[in-house]
Amino acid sequence: MFKRSGSLSLALMSSFCSSSLATPLSSAEFDHVARKCAPSVATSTLAAIAKVESRFDPLAIHDNTTGETLHWQDHTQATQVVRHRLDARHSLDVGLMQINSRNFSMLGLTPDGALKACPSLSAAANMLKSRYAGGETIDEKQIALRRAISAYNTGNFIRGFANGYVRKVETAAQSLVPALIEPPQDDHKALKSEDTWDVWGSYQRRSQEDGVGGSIAPQPPDQDNGKSADDNQVLFDLY
């Protein structure tokens, strides 16, 4: 009797789910929140994952138990649905970064927090960092990043390649338009900044002279160079 009542309640609550999707975060909004709440991971990497996971919708919920994907416009209603389904022992992927409910306790998340952009991004960054092994070269770091992304999706360093998830994130990263930043007033400083490299940051350069795209391994920076806002990033941008 209890199970039937619970199933009916779930069906009724699902019926109140808005047919129109919640407004996703804009690229500027996402960039702002990611830099504030998850500064240790490259914003573009988090954006690529968010695009694949939720299409930047902080109120997206995927019920792995029933196979439903729900989108809400009201945070309170979405929180109630998450709590109700967790009480029914469902496995849920919740919020902007689609954090699985099994990880809530480990990450210090609540249903309310998981549906907010800042806690979701912070949790995602912690999960990626915990799975990122690093490396000696840029290529090794890129491989380690992709393995961390695989583990983010599957809990395994290999299965995310086999199921196509890593490739989806790579494709999403390539399709995202970089954020427009304020150009430095001093052209000389701008040129110097382009040559700056930090092992914890990200570095990409495309040859304009030859018209050929590709990453070029940079030289280490001078010790006098100032640090940018990205110098504390642990994970590289995908390239």
UniProtKB/Swiss-Prot annotation:
UniProt record similarity statement: Belongs to the virb1 family.
Keyword Signal listed: yes
Cystine crosslinks: none
Region forming the signal peptide: 1-28
Which stretches are transmembrane?
none
Q: What does this protein do?
A: VirB proteins are suggested to act at the bacterial surface and there play an important role in directing T-DNA transfer to plant cells.
Looking up Pfam families in the UniProt record yields: SLT (PF01464)
Presence of keyword Signal: yes
Stretches the record annotates as Disordered: 202-232
Q: Which UniProt keywords apply?
A: Crown gall tumor, Plasmid, Signal
InterPro entries cross-referenced by the UniProt entry = Lysozyme-like_dom_sf (IPR023346), Transglycosylase_SLT_dom_1 (IPR008258)
Q: Which SUPFAM superfamilies match?
A: Lysozyme-like
- What is the protein name given in its UniProt record? Protein virB1
